């Protein structure tokens, strides 16, 4: 009798709609969010080394010139617990590859502009690279200037660089692709800014 009674109380759940809160829905949407990031800067400043350390946790002393662009991907967990999938395009910085760079700016939500903190010429090129992404990239692209090789004696004054970045309205961080200092932090900060600035667009483009 007990068995019969419990059977009569069973109901089908296939037509039941599960209601989630706005916060839960945002987290679900953000978990499937994919964003494109471009790495820019002169040849030899350490763009590939930064990407290598982020994605594989290692550093290589061998310098290999990036021809055109290299593609990597990495997941970043945001403060709200959601995951953002970064599609990272590491562009070649040599003069002969510069004409190809704008091809990779399209649809980029973020740009990491790298210079060598021990190379004044690479700092002088920052203006060129920032103008490149502002002129040829998407509107309101999140730009972060990165001083690489922090593990070496510094030839450039950080305060001067910070002032330059304030004038350009871009973010700034120092890092070392050799020791790994601030590598993850810089991409976490960039991902957070992209999420804050573009979350409505990202949800629309990543249903």
Curated annotation (Swiss-Prot):
Transmembrane segments annotated in the record for this chain: none
- What is stated about the way this protein's activity is regulated? Alternates between an inactive GDP-bound form and an active GTP-bound form. Activated by guanine nucleotide-exchange factors (GEFs) and inactivated by GTPase-activating proteins (GAPs).
Q: For this UniProt entry, what is the primary localization, expressed as one broad class?
A: membrane
Chain positions of motif Effector region:
63-71
Molecular function (GO) terms for this protein are:
G protein activity; GTP binding; GTPase activity
Q: According to the lineage, what is the superkingdom?
A: Eukaryota
Its topology with respect to the membrane? Lipid-anchor
Mutating residue 2 to A has which effect? Loss of myristoylation. Loss of myristoylation
Q: Where in the cell is it found?
A: Cell membrane; Vacuole membrane; Vesicle
Keyword terms:
Cell membrane, GTP-binding, Hydrolase, Lipoprotein, Membrane, Myristate, Nucleotide-binding, Protein transport, Transport, Vacuole
- Residues that bind GTP, according to the entry? 41-49, 60-66, 90-94, 148-151, 176-178
The record places the lipid (N-myristoyl glycine) at 2
**Can you supply one Gene Ontology CC term for this chain's record?**
food vacuole
EC numbers: 3.6.5.2
GO BP: intracellular protein transport
Q: How is it modified after translation?
A: Myristoylation is required for cell membrane and food vacuole membrane localization.
Q: Which SUPFAM superfamilies match?
A: P-loop containing nucleoside triphosphate hydrolases
Name the reaction it catalyses. Answer: GTP + H2O = GDP + phosphate + H(+)
Q: What does this protein do?
A: Small GTPase which regulates vesicle trafficking between organelles. May be involved in the trafficking of the N-myristoylated AK2 from the endoplasmic reticulum to the parasitophorous vacuole membrane.
Q: Which family does it belong to?
A: Belongs to the small GTPase superfamily. Rab family.
SUBUNIT field? Interacts with CK1. May interact with ARF1.
Q: What is this protein called?
A: Ras-related protein Rab-5B
Q: Which gene encodes it?
A: RAB5b
